[in-house]
């Protein structure tokens, strides 16, 4: 049976993640409050930010920036978008 949670981003009951995506308290918080759908949406957005802003995951400042954007993304705050990116038509 799929575990459901009240998603912090989408404010509705949705299927949760199968396991915490990070170790420690941060991973447990995401596991408890972020749906699998929201996590998948974040991974796509994270990839877009890394590529478009040319972030280097070996650089501590870039990792800190991305972690801050992830918090904003899940909490509903205004988060960074890739400059000039136009999503494909559906």
Swiss-Prot record:
GO BP term (any one): cellular response to oxidative stress
Function: Could be a mediator in iron transactions between iron acquisition and iron-requiring processes, such as synthesis and/or repair of Fe-S clusters in biosynthetic enzymes.
InterPro entries according to UniProt: Fe_traffick_prot_YggX, Fe_traffick_prot_YggX_sf
Superkingdom, natural source: Bacteria
Family classification: Belongs to the Fe(2+)-trafficking protein family.
GO cellular component annotations of the record: cytosol
This protein's UniProt keywords: Iron
Protein name per UniProt: Probable Fe(2+)-trafficking protein
Organism: Pseudomonas fluorescens (strain SBW25)
A GO molecular function held by the record: iron ion binding
Keyword Iron: yes
